[in-house]
């Protein structure tokens, strides 16, 4: 075990030689030094984890904390942003046990198979409505505002029980948060507006409960309004941004692999597996998952000291050839068992089954409705969100 740095610390690699592949440096580190020194923007020297095996170890070991008030992130945060002195109520993904355990238990009781099944027809209806509008307006279309952004937003509104008359406001503010070019002030104002809308929604559900997630949480009697609002805020933003990013980037990836689209058209039952492969291959959480060591831990021969920041590169782990054969190829028929696009361990994505349903329905409906779907610009002209925490296409012009 070594507590000295075998190589000089470097900043998190972000430069992509090819738009659908992670930075090449990550692959070299995974092969040569899967736990390597990482220089954080504030000057702290922590660690970057790039192999599948080491990533699983970190994410399943509670000696590595997910607490948002002590985390170190490997990217520059917007000017004016302040680190949390305390994690806000309900923001459970930024908490450790026992707080995380309590919230997770309550939410697991709401993400039931019955509720997910009940949502499927509505997600199908929402998807078809947006495809109808695309067809009515005719090509070309920008798939991001026409398809990728609204479908997940409306699906989350269904889950939370947002009244129909309020959904446009939720959509508009969520779009502001995700839109490239929004100023820091605009994003902050949109976050505040969403928080206010969810607080109002919680008050409504107290008075008029329905068969939705927020009403179900209220019925437990175990959460106060601040916690309920925080949970709603977290679910809305996390569930919208991740799935919307996958719908835009996933469609872009499929259109760049016409032979795989041909396989899907010949055998539509492959769409479920294609969703898994897209998540593995693209891994949109491009800056990784932050953790903080709570005590000294040995990992892959390196001594991680208490207080050290650890960044787990899910993108590198999901391209590990030691876990996935021919890992850099895109194959909708491959076995994707073990991918970590939804993270791993006790903090893995709670809404992953809903996200899978949304993507399977959306991709299959899109390519069924528009069998000649193609990019309307050169592939290299599609602008990508290289600076965003969730990698995605900011515009996706298509024709059919």
Walk through the language-model features, giving the residues of each.
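Cytochrome P450
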Residues: 1-400
